[in-house]
Swiss-Prot record:
Gene: PMADS1
Tissue: Predominantly expressed in petals and stamens, less in carpels and sepals.
GO CC terms: nucleus
Pfam family, one: SRF-TF
Cellular compartment(s): Nucleus
Protein name, UniProt field: Floral homeotic protein PMADS 1
Domain K-box: 84-174
MADS-box domain mapped to chain residues: 3-58
Alphabetical keyword list: Activator, Developmental protein, DNA-binding, Nucleus, Transcription, Transcription regulation
Length: 231
């Protein structure tokens, strides 16, 4: 039974369209390769799918550029001439802009002023004044930032100094390190410069304590007995 003729029109289903594209592309590349091998032909195929993906085939004996050059030579046309002329025009405009910018820079530096008339000189002065204003504002902003940074450093140093003073005053409040406890207690008196320390014991009055201890009378109802401690 003969196959029905396929109607040539756009395939609406995207999946079917991609499948058909892949099959026919492979078939086309196969035919191009057969032409290259059987007939020693130079074949180039460039294909771009509906999704924007590029596929190409080129005979192994030639490059794409060589094939385009051969096409231009055979047909007698220059495919790159219009593109080259556009590039030349763009280059000319860029060079003109560069010359004008260099001239403006020289004029702002006080050079190349002989060709300027009165109005142009007035405009140049106004531009320079505006530039100086912006520079001056930026300078003051930088100075302000530096002052704020310096103030923060000063505040930090002052805070450290206050903390050191508080620590120093706390140490000066009890130079001997006498620590009392409620009721009967013992304490250690520490002398500076690594001197001997004395253990002080506050005891209830006791008239039968040995005489070889040192007694300190506080004037109250209890005595302080001290013992020398070795380091």
């Amino acid at each position: 039974m003969a196959r029905g003729k396929i109607q040539i029109k756009r395939i609406e289903n995207q999946t079917n369209r991609q499948v058909t594209y892949s099959k026919r592309r492979n078939g086309l590349f196969k035919k191009a390769n057969e032409l290259t091998v059987l007939c020693d032909a130079k074949v180039s195929i460039i294909m771009i799918s509906s999704t924007g993906k590029l596929h190409e085939f080129i005979s192994p004996s030639i490059t794409t550029k060589q094939l385009f050059d051969l096409y231009q030579k055979t047909v007698g046309v220059d495919l790159w001439n219009s593109h080259y002329e556009k590039m030349q025009e763009q280059l000319r405009k860029l060079k003109e802009v560069n010359r004008n910018l260099r001239k403006e820079i020289r004029q702002r530096m006080g050079e190349s002023l002989n060709d300027l008339n009165y109005e142009q000189l007035e405009e140049l002065m106004e531009n320079v004044d505006n530039s100086l204003k912006l520079i001056r504002e930026r300078k003051y902003k930088v100075i302000g930032n530096q002052i704020e940074t310096f103030k923060k450093k000063v505040r930090n140093v002052e805070e450290i100094h206050r903390n050191l003073l508080l620590e120093f005053d706390a140490r000066q409040e009890d130079p001997y390190g006498l620590v009392e406890q409620e009721g009967d207690y013992n304490s250690v008196l520490g002398f500076p410069n690594g001197g001997h320390r004395i253990l002080a014991l506050r005891l209830q009055p006791n008239h039968h304590q040995p005489n070889h201890h040192h007694h300190l009378h506080s004037g109250g109802g209890s005595d302080i007995t001290t013992f020398a401690l070795l380091e």
